[in-house]
Design a protein with these regions (language model features):
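Extracytoplasmic/secreted envelope proteins and their assembly/folding machinery
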Residues: 37, 65, 69, 80-83, ...
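Short, glycine-/small- and polar/acidic-enriched structural segments
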Residues: 22-150, 156-158, 174-177, 193, ...
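Conserved C-terminal helix/tail region of periplasmic/extracytoplasmic solute-binding proteins
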Residues: 288-318
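Bacterial N-terminal signal peptides that target proteins for export
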Residues: 1-8
Length: 318
């Protein structure tokens, strides 16, 4: 093809790309304590985005799931355990991306350093604090079952992480089930120790879940957003200090705590496949058997594998 014609074709393609980007609707992203926004900012993935991203802040996964259910946001990140609750509430959601969190204390059941509790079996008759419907809640259930105990053998107190450590340290409860960076904060202080880690008991998956309406109306934006988040996590794996500094600013936690958490955690995207769906179904069935869910939940409708091959729009627009 002659050079003038080649340049003309390239300019037409670029114009079409820019025009398409101008027509794209804003993507409404649920942001849990600024974590996704901070990740995308520090990794450079909020640059050259051919559509607007509107972030909304939520203090925890439960209200984030409620916002998704209500259609107030298009997409948000939450753990597999709270996602089951969202599906159980009838939320028209689908997982569009899954990131595996491989870390030393990504989730853990903690007890005071001087506690006489040495194994999970010692928790019988004790009080455990966690956040209801959280990954910490799921860890307690699985740990108790593995030790031959029932959830009725303990007493639960359901609080947010910011309140949970206070009641553990003042002796109101005997154990706390939580996740990073709270696990790192607690163990670094020397006041708490890990009774059991969720590394072998849980999948430790982080879901990006989108509403069915957003998938229908904003698929192009969602595919691009999924790819950006994936690239951002890959960047964070290789730049733990920079990532930790960004997270310290938004969480208010000391830099050394965030750095320890970042250095001990590796994020890796995994495909949406039959094995993942089976694992979540087992979690849903466990919640049903515990009476936490009032009716059976078929989780197979809550995934969209077509997003497995998502690539960023910016790669072609730049």
């Amino acid at each position: 093809m002659p050079l003038p014609r080649l340049l003309s074709t390239a300019l037409l393609c670029l114009a079409a790309t820019l025009a398409h980007g101008a027509d794209l609707q804003p993507l409404k992203v649920a942001n849990q304590k600024s974590t996704i926004k901070a990740l995308l900012q520090v990794s450079g993935e909020l640059e050259h985005v051919p559509y607007t991203i509107d972030f909304s802040e939520f203090p925890a996964a439960a209200p984030l799931g409620e916002a998704l259910n209500a259609g107030a946001v298009d997409v948000g990140a939450l753990g597999d355990a709270p996602y089951v609750f969202a599906l159980g509430a009838g939320a028209p959601l689908k997982v569009v991306s899954i990131t595996h969190m491989n870390g030393r204390y990504t989730t853990a059941l903690l007890v005071p350093q001087d506690s006489p509790i040495q194994q999970v079996g010692d928790l019988k008759g004790k009080r455990i604090v966690t956040t209801k419907g959280s990954i910490g809640h799921l860890l307690v259930i699985k740990a108790l079952h593995e030790a031959g105990l029932k959830t009725s053998d303990v007493t639960f107190a359901f609080l947010l992480p910011s309140e949970s450590r206070v009641v553990l340290e003042n002796g109101s409860v005997d154990a706390w089930s939580t996740w990073d960076p709270y696990t790192t904060v607690a163990t670094a202080s020397g006041q708490e120790r890990v009774l059991v880690s969720g590394a072998t008991l849980l999948t430790n998956h982080l879901y990006l879940a989108a509403t069915s309406q957003a998938i229908a109306d904003k698929r192009v934006q969602l595919q691009d957003f999924v790819a950006r988040v994936d690239r951002a996590w890959q960047w964070a794996n290789g730049h733990p200090r920079e990532y930790a500094a960004a997270m310290a600013k938004v969480t208010g936690l000391p830099l050394e705590i965030q750095l320890a958490a970042a250095q001990n955690t590796h994020m890796e995207r995994v495909p949406i496949d039959a094995q993942v769906i089976k694992g979540l179904q087992q979690t849903a069935d466990l919640y049903r058997s515990e009476g936490i869910l009032t009716k059976p939940v078929d989780v197979s409708h809550g995934f969209d594998p077509s997003f497995n091959a998502s690539t960023p729009l910016a790669a072609s627009a730049q």
